[in-house]
């Protein structure tokens, strides 16, 4: 009998806790996020704590990670975007490691839950909002009114631009969640289908699963990269009011 492919996304309490009537249990999702946070921190510490002129493998990897993200920030936002680099690097590491660790059997993919990805998107959204108002004051609201728009069209354009601005965290989070859920469901279905086959027919599906795992690992990193690219684009809009 084929197992439910959605069961891998169930949030399960590991340490049940309640306080003042609220459920604050430590779940498999929380454990996965804590593990990823520690892993990301250790990765950066190992890479840069004893930096040398001739880099080790870990230092070389850390430098590639650093340079790729700082170039991404500079190319999209510009020199003023340097202030956002820690946020962008943190998002990339957290999402990519979360996606990759979710590929491990019995591990939990927390990026498959909209509440997690939406929270990450809201961090970006709040940053753009606060920074935009701090930097441009009332001029920030000109973002919702494109230049050279006829006066009679202005109210409609303001409403449209406002809706687009508000919908950004929704689209950002849904894109990541949908890709993670779809990929993991496909792998689960194919893996369980192999179990029901006779030994003679198993080599081909197993080879297919190996290829799909490699592809899913690529997608895991790609989705983290896309998330950070779009975050940079949203931040650029408030930096330059474009």
From Swiss-Prot:
One of its GO terms (cellular component) is proton-transporting ATP synthase complex. InterPro entries: ATP_synth_F0_asu, ATP_synth_F0_asu_AS, ATP_synth_F0_asu_bact/mt, F0_ATP_A_sf. It is a multi-pass membrane protein. The chain crosses the membrane at residues 29-49, 83-103, 114-134, 140-160, 181-201, 206-226. PANTHER family: ATP SYNTHASE SUBUNIT A (PTHR11410:SF0). Belongs to the ATPase A chain family. This is ATP synthase subunit a. It comes from Orientia tsutsugamushi (strain Boryong). The gene is atpB.
